[in-house]
A protein has these predicted regions:
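Conserved non-catalytic scaffold segment of RNase H-like nuclease domains
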Residues: 2, 6-12, 17-123
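Substrate-binding/catalytic groove segments of enzymes
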Residues: 140-146, 163-172, 203
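Anionic group-transfer/hydrolysis microenvironments
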Residues: 17-19, 125-126, 131, 155
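Acidic, Mg2+-coordinating catalytic module of metal-dependent nucleases/exonucleases
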Residues: 117-127, 131-132, 169-203
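Substrate-recognition/cap helix-loop segment adjacent to the acidic, metal-dependent catalytic center
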Residues: 113, 127-149
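A short, structured active-site edge motif that brings together acidic residues
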Residues: 56-61, 145-161
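Active-site-proximal helix-loop-helix substrate-binding element of RNase H-like nuclease domains
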Residues: 65-69, 73-82, 152-191
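Residue-level signal for well-ordered alpha-helical scaffold segments within enzymatic catalytic domains
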Residues: 108-111, 131, 135, 159, ...
Length: 203
């Protein structure tokens, strides 16, 4: 990273993989998170690899969510995961002794985000990832560590900038397709930042 931008990551994007679309009580599998600076989009653009290396994730204990927090698994969502390629599901669906309690979500976030420097919080969909995050913090006695007015969603960001074109908000930027791993929370964050960067560069 250029020294000029060292420590100036003022944006974060996060993404959940889940076992339900119920944002209030659904079980979460993993959370991916990536901090970045929009100032770099034109002056010192990111590579896919740099963003991926900068991203972090936490994988959750599913059983404990059900037994302790009364969170629910959706059969239709579980069936969907079971129909995905094994290489997609292995990393997120197979239980591990390293899986974390959802109570660790708050510390995971604040340890990986410079809250004092934060200006914008992105998710792909603010009716999905954001309420999942807020609900988990509520379940574990924590408050959301950023004000509501920082929140944006990448779909609206991209739709606005792509208005009048035939390009969709889920397009894959040139050179990224072979690097992208579907349904991986870290890769989902990286891809949305690459989408925003590419659109800004082409304005």
């Amino acid at each position: 990273m250029s020294v000029a931008y060292e420590g100036l990551n003022d944006c974060v994007i996060y993404d959940f993989e889940t076992l339900s679309v119920d944002v209030n009580r659904g079980v979460v599998l993993s959370l991916g998170l990536l901090t970045f600076s929009r100032a770099r989009f034109t002056n010192n653009p990111y590579s896919y690899e740099e963003l991926l290396d900068s991203s972090v994730s936490i994988k959750y204990d599913v059983k404990k969510q059900v037994e302790v927090y009364d969170r629910k698994i959706s059969k239709s969502t579980l069936d969907w995961w079971n129909n995905q390629p094994k290489e997609t599901t292995a990393a997120v669906m197979v239980p591990s002794e390293n899986d974390k309690d959802i109570s660790e979500t708050y510390n995971f976030f604040v340890q990986n985000v410079n809250i004092n420097n934060l200006k914008t919080v992105f998710s792909r969909g603010n009716t999905f990832d954001i309420p999942f995050f807020e609900g988990i913090l509520n379940d574990t006695g924590k408050k959301v560590p950023y004000p509501f007015w920082m929140v944006r969603d990448t779909r609206s960001f991209l739709d606005g900038l792509l208005w009048g074109s035939d390009v969709k908000n889920d397009y894959i930027p040139e050179g990224c397709a072979e690097k992208f791993f579907k349904h991986d929370a870290r890769h989902d964050c990286v891809m949305d930042v690459m989408r925003m960067q590419t659109v800004i560069q082409n304005l």
